[in-house]
């Protein structure tokens, strides 16, 4: 379940809280380093093959956090192929905090020099880009803030707010009524429960 708490703080501050922040929602401001994008191969969107675009975001304190901006097809993989997705200056994004991905048993190793990234591991990207002040304990999945879908296609977060107490109450109320019905039917059939007609 996603925690619908919106933070106006840096990921570094959240990480420093010492809490379990996986899937925590936050807001970030900074500058995208579009020239240092990497592309996660083998990603799909509605059955279409493509990539996930991971862009470093430089924050006001010069620290860097990696942002998984979402899906693009091969035709729009490189920044030059989608100038409409490039930003100028400081921007603000919404996202959710994610732990570094674990490499699957049959997933190949990342090959940075060849541009083949299969698993999102912030520490490997940081070494490849020679970043010094970078967050490697987490990365952020950017989420959509509009119904209009644009490239890269960011994650869609749906939160179903349920009244668990009401559900439980209705469930047990139904069970109780059923048991009462069974009780009455049993005793009537056994002749233990009858109704006398008024004279």
List where the protein language model places each region.
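Surface-exposed, charge/polar-rich loops and edge strands
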Residues: 3-17, 21-199
């Amino acid at each position: 379940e996603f925690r619908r708490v919106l933070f106006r703080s840096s990921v570094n501050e959240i990480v420093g809280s010492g809490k379990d922040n996986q899937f925590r929602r936050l807001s970030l401001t900074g500058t995208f380093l579009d020239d240092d994008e990497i592309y996660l191969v083998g990603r799909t969107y509605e059955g279409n093959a493509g990539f996930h675009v991971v862009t470093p975001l430089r924050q006001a304190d010069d620290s860097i956090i990696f942002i998984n901006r979402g899906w693009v097809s091969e035709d729009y993989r490189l920044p030059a192929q989608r100038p409409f997705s490039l930003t100028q200056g400081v921007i603000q994004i919404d996202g959710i905090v994610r732990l570094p991905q674990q490499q699957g048993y049959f997933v190949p190793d990342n090959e940075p020099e060849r541009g083949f990234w299969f698993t999102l591991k912030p520490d490997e990207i940081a070494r490849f880009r020679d970043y010094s002040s970078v967050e490697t304990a987490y990365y952020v999945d950017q989420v959509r803030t509009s119904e209009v879908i644009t490239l890269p296609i960011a994650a869609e977060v749906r939160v179903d707010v349920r009244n668990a107490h009401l559900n439980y109450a209705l469930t047990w109320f139904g069970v109780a009524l059923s048991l009462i019905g069974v009780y009455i039917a049993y005793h009537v059939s056994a002749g233990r429960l009858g109704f006398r007609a008024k004279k």
